[in-house]
Regions:
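Active-site neighborhoods and metal-handling regions in enzymes and metal-associated proteins
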Residues: 1-96
């Protein structure tokens, strides 16, 4: 879940947390999220985080003039699937 509900939960060793920030400055809109590991995490979590980042980077490489959204999403999905993962198909994407 990207957008959690505030609670009294205290982070502990092995947790991961996603920080999602947006900004509007001088007519420009930005949005970014990053996942942080809290202390030592399990190897499978590290692997997931590595593939997530690599999938993002694959998509960014395809975000060039002349390409379409499908080119970007294909690169993301291909990288994720190469690691045995899948992509979320609902509740994704938004405009800024």
């Amino acid at each position: 879940m990207v957008h959690g509900i505030p609670s009294g939960y205290e982070l502990k060793e092995g947790d991961i947390i996603s920080v999602d920030c947006g900004v509007i400055l001088n007519g420009w809109y930005g949005d970014s999220a990053y996942t942080f590991a809290v202390g030592e995490v399990k190897p499978e979590i590290i692997r997931l985080m590595e593939y997530t980042r690599a999938s993002l980077e694959a998509g960014v490489r395809e975000a060039v003039a002349g390409n379409r959204i499908g080119d970007i999403s294909c690169a993301v999905q291909s990288k994720a699937e190469s690691g045995g993962y899948s992509v979320v198909r609902t509740l994704v994407g938004h405009g800024i």
